[in-house]
Amino acid sequence: MYADIVIDISHESLDRPFQYRIPESLVGQVQPGMWVLVPFGRRNTQKKGFVLKLGTKANIDPDRIKELTEIISDDNSSDKIRIALAVWMYREYGGNLIQSLRVVMPARKNVRPKQVSFFVRTSDEKRFLDYLDLARKKNWKGRVRLMEALLCRDYISSAFARQQLKIASDAIKALEEEKLIQIETKRFYRSVLPKESASLEKKQLNEEQQAIVDKLISSYQAGVRTPALLYGITGSGKTEVYMHLIEWMIRQNKQVIVLIPEISLTYQVILNFYSRFGEQVSMINSRLSDGERSDQLERARNGEISIMVGPRSALFTPFSNLGLIIVDEEQEGAYNSEQIPRYHTRETAGKLAQLTNSLLLLGSATPSIESFSRAESGEYRKFCLTKRAVLGSCLPNVQVVDMRKELESGNRSVFSRELREKMEECLAKKQQMMLFINRRGFSRVVSCRSCGKPIECPHCDVALTEHLGDKLVCHYCGYTKAMPRSCPLCGSPYLAGFGLGTQKAEMMIKAQFPSARVLRMDMDTTSKKDGHEQILDSFRRREADILVGTQMIVKGHDFPGVTLVGILAADMSLYNCDFRSSERTFQLLTQAAGRAGRGMEPGNVIIQTYDPENYSIQTAANQDYESFYHQEIRFRRRMQYPPIGLMCEVMAVSAEEKLANQWIWQVQLLINKRFCDIIKIIGPSDAPIARLKDMWRKHLYIRSNDHKAYLEAMELIQEITEQAAVQKVSIFVTVC
């Protein structure tokens, strides 16, 4: 018996299966989907490999085939489906097959299972009670405490007995010798759920919500698996629709994956789901320890949980009876993987749903242009929620403030007069507010006022950001240095910080409103494991009046006490060198505005901008997604950008600028030569950040309406990638 095995080495020349003989002792045990150890190379170094398939015929001379060493992970549940998904990702997004396999079916960490010891009674009740009477007469206090405790419950943990009941070892040993108790051990899963959670009442659905739930259930029962887009205004109750669908799925013995874009959302979502579904739900994210993560996956494999919540990695939960995949806030860029394979979670979830005959449900108040276009064309089913779920709650009043006029009138503060007045009013009424600025740090850049040059990162082509504590930080590679006393280039002492970050905003708020209680939420304040939870919990308990932060504060959070949202710089993402910049600006502003007035009090939103006429800002202020969509799709159609045409970015990365440049031009030359009239190339040029972590980056864009030619071009790029690897040049493809 033979096994085709992919070696766990990311190199283009090894991107194929190697055949190994299965030793007789492991025949019947080795299965597709397992991680194994095999001898590899001339020195027969032990390497980890992944079993793709089994066979009885040797592909080469049997005497030349090496023997597999041992199994290191016997997880082969749902193996065929997950192998198929990994192969699809490899073909769709490039890279190596082993890289896709690592994402979809990661090898289990060598984590020791957590064992718990506990005491149980082993004798009949009469004998137990007789001995208890004797122990009382003899004044054996330790034995009496333990036996009395065991009368009230089936078992007592060893830790509880020793620490809380203060039972000494000799008392335990005596009861064991009398065969009145025995020590047992069982596997204990590390908990990642909230320690305390109030019971969440099941909400009555309104007519819109109920109609959508009924339609999705009836179509599911009829065998319809066409993906569905749930499009609803902020606060319209999409989560409650999810909850009712999940409840129905669990009754059908189906399992559910709920994807959320940000780790910061995990706490609130898991709190809601745990309140409704209890121990049936778990979560997974990058903040968990290896042990915690391993335990949650083990529980999923064993069928001990029915719902897994988390960011994109949760998609690969090893459920065996998947029925529903929910992608909440499906438009978010966080669903794009920045690691190879550079997969998109929405598309990958669609493929997994197809392979498992599951339903894919996408939810958003601001759907991606791609998803809404598919819904308009009938590729997706579209369901709409048009009113807020809380009775009496309505969309907030939104005011756009032209900061050019503020400057003309003499106001040089980052707070417009309208925003300052609303903040004073909000504080006077003991209400809460959120202020959004999508840049962390103190000042965006520190420049010399003599020579005009910014202080840059020595490893990246970006300016360092000023942070509190007189330090400069690169937000791309993490490089940190103390604030210099003079310009490194000309020696001038006149250095100044320009631009606004969350730290400076927090300082200015405290200066203007000294009695206000202020919390800041950004990457700096949430770097610890429970950072998000502590800040959000504190704000939810009204221990602060103002929450200032980056985009992590505006996505999906529900604070009924918030009546004011201030967007300090709405233009910040509008003029990025990305054709989706208008879409991202609209989505961010709409999501931010949607945090206000979610309770019974009316909400107000102030959008500060230097470009108030821009259609992204105007339609966001009106909370009018469809108007934005129709204007944006006209632009995409005119430019043949996705979803109208196919487009991807090709990037060459090397420690030597000359090599990166040479290979990106090689890509351009070969594609032009073969597809000159079918595929359009934009570039090559420097990437927006030309040097990142000491690596040079050159890129180009490929655009086409011919799907066949586009796929052939991807295959050609894969061939070039293998050639470039010889010179230590990496070529990455990112689907736009």
Language-model segments: residues:
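Accessory, non-ATPase domains that flank or precede helicase/AAA+ motor cores in DNA-metabolism machines
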Residues: 1-364, 371, 376-391, 674, ...
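Short beta-strand elements
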Residues: 519, 675-687, 727-735
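Short amphipathic alpha-helix segments
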Residues: 625, 660-682
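Composition- and surface-driven signal marking solvent-exposed, interaction-prone regions
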Residues: 161, 448, 663-666, 714-716
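A broad, structural surface signal
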Residues: 31, 35, 84-91, 173, ...
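Inter-lobe coupling/hinge segments of SF2-like helicase ATPases
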Residues: 200-206, 210, 224-661, 688-690, ...
